[in-house]
Regions:
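A short, structured beta-strand/loop element
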Residues: 16-55
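Generic detector of bulky aromatic hydrophobic side chains
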Residues: 9, 31, 37-40, 60-63, ...
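Generic preference for hydrophobic/aromatic residues in regular secondary structure cores
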Residues: 11, 45-48, 67
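Negatively charged, low-complexity tracts enriched in Asp/Glu with abundant Ser/Thr
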Residues: 1-12
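Short linear motifs in intrinsically disordered/low-complexity regions
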Residues: 2, 15, 19-20, 43, ...
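Well-ordered alpha/beta subsegment
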Residues: 51-85
Length: 85
């Protein structure tokens, strides 16, 4: 389950159970398939050390905030029923 942010950015949730169990709910922002940032879901905060510009940060925070409940649901589902690989 991926959420398109703009033409080259999207938001995705870890698919593996172990990854979801290891950390608090978060999503990864990818640019053309490469992870460039991590965003915590509650509260919505972008992790330092990312490679996004100010406009992208604003757009990411807005998009994640608007989809936070759906992302948290998917994270919790994957925590229980995600892949074992």
């Amino acid at each position: 389950n991926k959420i398109r942010i703009n033409w080259n950015l999207q938001c995705e949730i870890d698919q593996k159970k172990d990854d979801c169990r290891r950390e608090a709910p978060h999503c990864h922002i990818t640019r053309n398939g490469v992870r460039v940032a991590q965003v915590w879901l509650n509260p919505v905060i972008i992790e330092s050390g990312h490679s996004l510009d100010r406009n992208e940060i604003d757009l990411v925070i807005k998009t994640v905030s608007e989809n936070r409940f759906e992302l948290e649901e998917q994270y919790e589902y994957n925590k229980e029923y995600g892949a074992d690989y």
